[in-house]
Amino acid sequence: MSWQTYVDDHLMCEVDGNPGQQLSAAAIIGHDGSVWAQSSTFPKFKPEEITGIMKNFDEPGHLAPTGLYLGGTKYMVIQGEPIAVIRGKKGSGGVTIKKTGQALVFGVYDEPVTPGQCNLIVERLGDYLIEQGL
């Protein structure tokens, strides 16, 4: 299975079987910032944004004072799981980032998708990749 298939079928899937309800954007990105696969809607990010995200996984709380930036959009960092998941919020939408051994799994959402639905989609794929040694 290609990385793009993981994004298309496992991240950009229908949410809870509701046609037309899906994440706004998704991607799988290597720890070094290389794009493994992404949806056509995933924002063009800056290398320093990925560096900041990786630093927050190593030093939880690093992004809290400044916010999490992705494609120039600022998200307020909300509760996550140290070393495993970062969650950000902006208005009615947000982002969930799951760290695996080699990659970062991103899900970006907006209403009507809820934070919990995005978390479930992103973390389920991230956990699967971790089980596969990725």
UniProtKB/Swiss-Prot annotation:
InterPro entries in the cross-refs:
PFN (IPR048278), PFN_euk (IPR005455), PFN_sf (IPR036140), Profilin_CS (IPR027310)
Question: What is the organism field in this record?
Answer: Daucus carota
PANTHER family (UniProt xref): PROFILIN, PROFILIN-5
Highest taxon listed in the record's lineage: Eukaryota
Q: Does the keyword Metal-binding apply?
A: no
Q: How does it assemble?
A: Occurs in many kinds of cells as a complex with monomeric actin in a 1:1 ratio.
* Name recorded for this polypeptide: Profilin
Family to which this protein belongs = Belongs to the profilin family.
Record-linked Pfam families = Profilin
